[in-house]
Curated annotation (Swiss-Prot):
Cofactor: Mg(2+)
Entry similarity comment: Belongs to the adenylosuccinate synthetase family.
Catalytic EC class: ligase
Cross-referenced InterPro entries: Adenylosuccin_syn_GTP-bd (IPR018220), Adenylosuccin_syn_Lys_AS (IPR033128), Adenylosuccinate_synth_dom1 (IPR042109), Adenylosuccinate_synth_dom2 (IPR042110), Adenylosuccinate_synth_dom3 (IPR042111), Adenylosuccinate_synthetase (IPR001114), P-loop_NTPase (IPR027417)
EC number(s) from the headed UniProt entry: 6.3.4.4
PROSITE patterns registered for this protein in UniProt: ADENYLOSUCCIN_SYN_1 (PS01266), ADENYLOSUCCIN_SYN_2 (PS00513)
Binding site for IMP: 21-24, 46-49, 137, 151, 232, 247, 319
Name of the protein: Adenylosuccinate synthetase
GO molecular function: adenylosuccinate synthase activity; GTP binding; magnesium ion binding
Binding residues annotated for GTP, in chain numbering: 20-26, 48-50, 321, 347-349, 429-431
Active-site residue numbers: 21 (proton acceptor), 49 (proton donor)
Presence of keyword Metal-binding: yes
Length: 446
């Protein structure tokens, strides 16, 4: 028997290399023209992907960005935590805009559910932390992942076994309500109301629920191209980020396999999305930081300009993002963790008009020079950035679609990023529209 495999499609993983908000949604939307399926493999509705097509702005929080393409199948993998309420709200918004969603959306039966008590715990916990709060979105993501690890989570497939679901829900609420009332001093969550709401979603979800792992395997074996869409960013990863100022899931490339039910051999090209500057939402160390709306000591005028020109406000929470220079030393950490094949630099146009542009290429920590972001929030917080300065450009990069038409200074800045990172730039995004993109290396045709 021949050991030669059947011809497979080409699969691409899109990963954020910073603290999220890198512009993954636009890039995924662009790449979807070459894919037959898009897969979400982690996170929940705590991160928004903003797409601008023509004069229409769409924010997707849970449903894969590929839903905007009429022939593409969208999968929500087992690594996602799913709020049925948030899902159907998003489906309603998309269907009101004329999109066929439910026939093209497939949900893993093993996906963990976010229920009202997860949201209640999230809010109560942040309130109790006070000034030491992590800065979660308050949508129950972390508590849902906690239940999953503790093996008490209710999953999508449990909705179709009402007796088992009701028993497990009662046990879960006994535990969580005890914590809410006795430790956090908050109101308990009502069992009957929670059960009724959950059961109301069961029949609506059923047509969309399937064995996603098997479906993806079959799609790949038939030669289809799969696109895996990450949420958040590498530096927010629960294991590899600036812990404890991280999200509650693994948002690195390796989890594209575990979070969707495919093997690692299925991940052929890893595209790292990198903003031309850095942003961060919420608490946590940020070595190249210039501006923080809530910190009087971080009010640098260039940082404020980056926030204003880049419209740096959370697409889900509306919170102002902290801004700073591009950190290539942190990017090197992300490249190491994700085995990136290439980079996509986004929002280059936000740097237009700056007299000088800085690139963080390393740090000084306790008298020693480092060329890569260290592990652990305590060490990162003590890092002093080492910068290289570049002359800005007078012309605009906005909407440019060809490399040779970029200002020479912009080209030199981008080439230096490649040199420091040790990886090629595959794409450059010069605006929010799908076609405002410079293609240097096609991920699906590499």
């Amino acid at each position: 028997m021949s050991s030669k495999r059947q011809t497979k499609g080409c699969n691409v993983v899109v990963i954020g290399t910073q603290w999220g908000d890198e512009g993954k949604g636009k890039v995924v939307d662009w790449l979807t023209d070459h894919a037959q399926a898009v897969v979400r493999f982690q996170g929940g509705h705590n991160a928004g992907h903003t797409l601008i097509i023509g004069d229409k702005k769409t924010i997707l929080r849970l449903i894969p960005s590929g839903i905007m393409h009429k022939t593409v199948i969208c999968y929500i993998g087992n690594g996602v935590v799913l709020s049925p309420e948030a899902l159907f709200k998003e489906i309603g918004e998309l269907e009101a805009a004329g999109l066929d969603v439910q026939s093209r959306l497939k949900i893993s039966e093993a996906t963990t559910l976010i229920l009202p008590y997860h949201v209640a715990i999230d809010h109560a916990r942040e309130k109790k932390r006070g000034e030491a709060k992590i800065g979660t979105t308050g949508r129950g993501i972390g508590p849902a992942y906690e239940d999953k690890v503790a093996r008490r989570a209710l999953r999508v497939q449990d909705l179709f076994y009402p007796e088992k679901f009701s028993e497990q829900l009662r046990e879960n609420l006994e535990y969580h309500n005890f914590m809410l009332t006795n430790y956090y001093g908050a109101e308990p969550v009502n069992y009957e109301k929670t059960l009724s709401e959950a059961m109301s979603y069961a029949e609506r979800l059923k047509p969309m629920v399937m064995d996603v792992s098997s479906a993806l395997y079959a799609a790949e074996q038939s030669g289809q191209n799969l696109l895996f869409e990450g949420a958040q960013g590498t530096l927010l990863d629960i294991d590899h980020g600036t812990y404890p100022y991280v999200t509650s899931s693994n948002c690195v490339a390796g989890n594209a396999a575990a979070g969707s039910g495919v093997g690692p051999d299925s991940l052929q090209y890893i595209l790292g999305i990198t903003k031309a500057y850095c942003t961060r939402v919420g608490a946590g160390p940020f070595p190249s930081e210039l501006y923080d709306h809530d910190n009087p000591a971080k009010q640098d005028l260039i940082g404020i300009r980056l926030a204003e020109v880049g419209k740096e406000f959370g697409s889900v929470t509306g919170r102002p993002r902290r801004t700073g220079w591009l950190d290539a030393a942190a990017l090197k950490r992300s490249i190491q963790i994700n085995s990136l094949s290439g980079l996509c630099i986004t929002k280059l146009d936000v740097l237009d008009g700056l007299e000088t542009i800085r690139l963080c290429v390393g740090y000084t920590l306790d008298g020693k020079k480092l060329d890569m972001l260290p592990r652990g929030a305590e060490s990162v917080a003590r890092c002093e950035p080492i910068y290289e300065d570049f002359p800005g450009w007078k012309g605009t990069t906005f909407g440019i679609r060809e490399w040779d038409k970029l200002p020479v200074e912009a080209q030199k800045f981008l080439r230096r990023i490649e040199e420091v990172a040790g990886k090629p730039i595959a794409m450059v995004s010069t605006g929010p529209e799908r076609d405002e993109t410079i293609l240097l290396q096609h991920p699906f045709q590499d």
